[in-house]
A protein has these predicted regions:
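Preference for long, well-ordered alpha-helical segments
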Residues: 111, 121-125, 134-138, 487, ...
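Amphipathic alpha-helical interface segments
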Residues: 184-186, 438-511, 515, 527
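Amphipathic, well-ordered alpha-helical segments in soluble domains
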Residues: 65, 369, 395-399, 441, ...
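A structural-propensity feature for long, helix-poor, extended segments
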Residues: 406-452, 547-556
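Conserved phosphate/anionic-ligand binding catalytic regions in large, soluble enzymes, centered on
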Residues: 7-9, 85-92, 373-400, 501-520
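Polytopic transmembrane helical bundles with strong interfacial aromatic enrichment
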Residues: 356-365, 371, 479, 486, ...
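Amphipathic alpha-helix face/heptad-repeat signature
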Residues: 388-392, 420, 427-434, 473-483, ...
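Long, contiguous binding/interaction regions
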Residues: 1-368, 375, 453, 461
Length: 566
């Protein structure tokens, strides 16, 4: 799985789209990065840009954008309603999928260092990327804004983490930049069956982390209680990492709870929704749906789908499409307008952009796939078919698990079978990927053979490319073997404890999985034969032989179980 991060740089220009277009063109020029949104603000004279991609590519795109902004924006002339201290005012990195905050911090600090050293721009690291606790808060780093920058740059306490520590002709033009690492922020509104902003605010105060001011006597009209420093004493709300207010939206004719979920690993979308439902019900108000503003990581939607299925005591071993559908319907995300997953889920947006114009075997229907296999084209071949057999084996195992989870009289065992279904589904997903991966590996070998070979240098480069491609084409079917064999554990469990009416389906799953193992191993052997590295080739063949023998034994064991029950 690819690591994905989001980057949300804020540029101190919101009126001249010619400048903004030049900055965003730098981002678009980096392969592997998707420009999600460009949001200029005239009053703030500021544009918020959102991009997503793999970490290295996003950092490269961010660097190029910061460089272009430093060339085009003159902070000496800047005026706007929003706090700012640089041409690129802030540049936070946000982990999206398959990457930790700790890794994101390292990328943020590396980006900050590069901006400071190569562009000679003062850089402050904030939030999780901060080197000291007092610099975690962006407002503290930006105190006094651009106008106070000259004094702060040379200050012992507030000099930048990277870049020049003086205000000269260049830094006076560029200002400073704050580079940070923060959690993904989800802007999320919950719809109410009321037009009352006051009642919506009451619910917002119930749930938001900050809560509401403590009062003497009457909780609504009583005098606000102050602490020894004269600040309001607050009664915390029920949800951590949540900011919320109530408002009335004239366009929809309803009041909403407008929330910023600042850390969805602490309070998820579905947890926030359910808590608002509870607090609204306490006040005689009904939640009718919700609205997602902006984009959301795939995991957040899948987690929501699983959460609502578990509440129903239903199996969660279903497709991503089904989980998203459950999430949308349960949260009422389609109440105000249709919810389009391909335009709202970050990974899907990036996937569609990266795969534009490409054709995939897994997108074909059964007739098309069979015809493509039967054609005179050498791919897809046995490797892709082996992977697909494994995918069908895990699909059958998952089907038996789901049928068992929902079997009448087995209600108390729903979670046991749901867990098996999730495992089976995970293998199916991986093996489906291997269908195209195997064909891609074959095509990579063909591309390597097509390289020029006129000079000695070209011949050497071509030979190395062939070796690299052949090694990759050996590793791909070996991964297929392992997935096929590992999924047999789910098949066996379903033969043993699953719905007895479906035991023969488990048997067919065993046959398909074993065939997937042996078929993939044939590809391992034929590709390994072309490797110069005989030690590696012999090792992978030896390991493959052991997997084949284990798969054959597992098939025998499963079929014995199946035959004993029919």
């Amino acid at each position: 799985m690819k690591k994905l991060i989001e980057c949300v740089p804020n540029f101190s220009e919101g009126n001249d789209m010619h400048i903004i277009d030049q900055i965003t063109a730098e981002i678009k020029a980096v392969e592997g990065v998707s420009l999600i949104d460009v949001d200029p603000g005239k009053a703030t004279n500021r544009t918020v840009v959102t991009m997503v991609g793999t970490p290295e590519e996003v950092c490269e795109a961010a660097f190029r954008a910061v460089k272009k902004a430093s060339e085009l924006i003159d902070m000496k002339k800047h005026k706007g309603a929003h706090p700012r201290f640089g041409a690129t005012d802030v540049c936070p990195l946000v982990p999206v999928s398959n990457i930790t905050m700790e890794e994101t911090v390292e990328y943020a600090r590396a980006l900050a260092k590069r901006i400071g050293e190569e562009l000679n721009i003062p850089v402050y690291c904030y939030e999780n990327a901060a080197f000291t606790p007092e610099r975690r808060n962006l407002a503290t780093c930006r105190a006094g804004e651009y106008e106070a920058l000259g004094e702060r740059l040379s200050s012992e306490q507030w000099h930048p983490d990277f870049g020049p520590r003086e205000l000269n002709e260049w830094t006076a033009k560029t200002g400073a930049t704050a580079v940070g690492a923060r959690n993904f922020l989800v802007a999320y509104n919950v719809n109410l069956n009321t037009t009352s902003t006051r009642r919506a605010n009451a619910i917002a105060f119930d749930v938001r982390e900050r809560g509401r001011a403590k009062r003497e006597g009457n909780p609504i009209t009583g005098k606000i209680v102050k602490d020894e420093k004269g600040k309001n004493v607050m009664i915390p709300g029920t949800l951590k990492s949540v900011k919320a207010i109530g408002w009335f939206i004239e366009e929809y004719g309803i009041a909403q709870i407008s929330m910023n979920l600042t850390d969805i690993s602490v309070t998820s979308v579905h947890e926030a929704f359910d808590e608002v439902c509870r607090k609204a019900q306490d006040r005689g108000i009904r939640v009718t749906g919700s609205e997602l503003v902006g984009v959301i990581p795939l995991k957040a939607m899948l987690d929501a789908g699983r959460y609502f299925l578990r509440k129903q005591q239903r199996s969660t071993g279903v497709s991503d499409k089904e989980l998203i559908k459950i999430a949308v319907k349960s949260l009422g995300l389609d109440e105000l307008y249709p919810f389009e997953p391909r335009k709202k889920i970050i990974e899907y947006i990036l996937e569609d952009e990266m795969n534009q114009g490409k054709k995939f075997l897994i997108d074909m229907n059964l007739h098309e796939f069979a015809d493509e296999t039967a054609s005179e084209s050498p791919a897809p071949g046995g490797g892709s078919i082996s992977a697909y057999m494994g995918a069908l084996a895990s699909s059958l195992a998952t089907m038996v698990a789901n049928l068992s989870s929902h079997k009448r009289g087995w209600d108390e065992r729903w979670e046991e079978f749901s867990n098996w279904a999730e495992r089976g589904k995970a293998y199916q997903v991986e093996l489906i990927k291997m269908v195209d991966e195997d064909t891609n590996a074959f095509n990579r070998i063909m591309d390597a053979f097509g390289l020029p070979k006129k000079t000695d240098e070209e011949k050497a480069a071509r030979h190395q490319a062939i070796q690299d491609a052949t090694k990759f084409a050996t590793e791909v079917p070996f991964k297929t073997m392992m997935f096929c064999y590992e999924c047999m554990e789910v098949v066996k469990a379903m033969a043993e404890i699953g719905n007895p009416n479906s035991v023969t389906d488990a048997g067919v799953g065993a046959l398909a999985a074993r065939s997937g193992v042996i078929g993939a191993f044939l590809n391992v052997k034929i590709n390994a034969a072309g490797l110069d590295d005989k030690e590696y080739a012999n090792d992978i063949i030896s390991r493959g032989e052991k997997v084949v023998e284990m798969a054959k034994q597992m098939e025998t064991d499963i079929l014995n179980i199946v035959n004993s029950k029919i």
